[in-house]
């Protein structure tokens, strides 16, 4: 069965995810809505969709089964509730919601209506992170002791990502990707967080309150994690990595080059995942399969609600300079 997917948003990630959905061979894009009609039409030409609008409400006229939402987090909430109200499955391009309150409501509505809602963290589907998860959970490096992560991204202060109100803040927009969502999937939900942040590079009124953040978290099993994330990334500096320290070895994820280095008591190997199946394609397949009741989605509302809660705790700790218990 070919599923009809409507798209809200016409930016780069809307294109990436729409093409991944089309590549499944089980979906068609039936309508596109963007604040700017010209943007929707340009996108429509690229993927062969004529039904383009400057509001998302008319998308109902295209008889969609589901909607892909790729817009700033603040208006994303209203679009998600609208889609659920009209009985549509939802693939949200980023975090589940802009606040934990909205995320909890989305989880409740989706469960009550029996609808699929998938948050946008595609990395959980990738071969690299599936291998890391097995590595840690099977204790291949002994007992895990600590984690250190770096996530740097050269943010553009003229875009919504840098806008505190539209984005919900850097911990929500950026740190849930690097690497709260993945660490939660592997280690479980953190117990507490202590964080500090600053705003040095771009300091105009209304921009994100934490441009750079250092967060220390305690995960189940007394695993400690240090996470550095920033919208500052000068030049060609590598910006994505995670180090896992175990009692009998260590592993390092190089997110810039999609490799995994493993050291087990001096026995070293490097695994290259550059040619592995695109996680966006795997997520698209899982999303569509879930329409038939299959338990294929890895970023469900009840799970990804916790990403939002952790991001809020990080922001709260940055402001209070106190440990926040979750």
Feature locations, PLM:
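Hydrophobic residues in well-ordered beta-strands that form the structural core
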Residues: 92, 117-119, 227, 253
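N-terminal Rossmann-like dinucleotide-binding module
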Residues: 1-47
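Active-site loop of classical SDR/Rossmann-like NAD(P)-dependent oxidoreductases
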Residues: 274-285, 302
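Contiguous beta-strand/loop segments that form the cofactor/metal-binding neighborhood of enzyme cores
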Residues: 174, 180-257, 281-295
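Rossmann-fold dehydrogenase core element
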Residues: 105-123, 142-149
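C-terminal helix-rich "cap/oligomerization" subdomain common to oxidoreductases
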Residues: 1, 27, 58, 66-69, ...
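Beta-loop-alpha module in the N-terminal Rossmann-like domain of NAD(P)-dependent dehydrogenases
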Residues: 38, 47-109
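Predominantly a Rossmann-like dinucleotide-binding segment in NAD(P)-dependent oxidoreductases
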Residues: 123-207, 321
